Amino acid sequence: MSNPDDLDDGLAYDFDAEHEVIFDAKDGSPPTKKVQKRSIEQDDDDVDDIDGKKEERNSEDDSNRPISKRQKKLQKKSKLIEKKKEESQYIVSQRKALPASSPEKIIEYLTTLIREKNPDLSVLELEELYFKRNDFLSTEKFDAERRLSNFPAFIQKFSVAPKKIVFSMSNIRVADVYRSLNGGKNCVKLFSKSKLKDDIATVERLLTDSSKKSNKNKDSLYFIATPTRMQKIIEATDLLFQGKEKLDIILDASYLDPKDNTILSFENAAVLCQVLKTFLNKKSSVKILLY
């Protein structure tokens, strides 16, 4: 019996998965061996699979690798820095929002400030320093941005008193507020750039001249000062407490200095509170407004 493998029947038999032998049945030409090649895409996929497995193993190794003490300290420090940054941003946003807040919120803020600045005082002593709801006029309805260009409009809308004291936190800011009101003979700057005796003389002159005029001819008087300078002036003269005319005290509370402090959070905020209480105790018809 003949071996089936020896038969030349013109059919191709697949003996190797990677090699394909083809016989030409027509002309009996010798078989041609064709190699089946893998595609480039298949090779790339295999490489990607290998790389992916390596990366996965490396990632697992990194996650299982113990963190050094130095790395732990750096991570802890980074978290603390981020937390302090968030707290700082929150405090700044609160300071910006305070001037447009209700009198109740303003009083709550000042009460906290007074307690922090006077840790050694008793409860009864602190009560004498706290402010009351009727000490303030609400300015919540002022919708415009609280910048110097809108300050005259704010004054016109909320302040009707013939005498106005504007408190700003620095000499430079006092000068800026003075310019926003166009200066003039009824507007005076009271700060440390001038001699104290000259400032006192200026206050006395303005008040004396104003008292000689009739009510119809009187213009509003503006005393723009830092808290520390006003403290020294009222220690030297009582003229600002005299008379029954209304007095509005306006706090330039929207301005933030380069350190994000306002007049209610800077180093002399306690002095400001003392000066405000002095006016409320010694002068009738006093109202406080925040700009």
UniProtKB/Swiss-Prot annotation:
Record-listed Phosphoserine modification sites: 59
Biased composition (Basic and acidic residues): 50-64
Keyword list, A-Z: Nucleus, Phosphoprotein
A Pfam family it matches: CMS1
Extra facts: Present with 1200 molecules/cell in log phase SD medium.
Transmembrane segments: none
Location (main, coarse): nucleus
Family classification: Belongs to the CMS1 family.
PANTHER family in the record: PROTEIN CMSS1 (PTHR24030:SF0)
Region (Disordered): 22-79
Residue stretches of biased makeup (Basic residues): 67-78
Organism encoding this protein: Saccharomyces cerevisiae (strain ATCC 204508 / S288c) (Baker's yeast)
Keyword Flavoprotein: no
Protein name, UniProt field: Protein CMS1
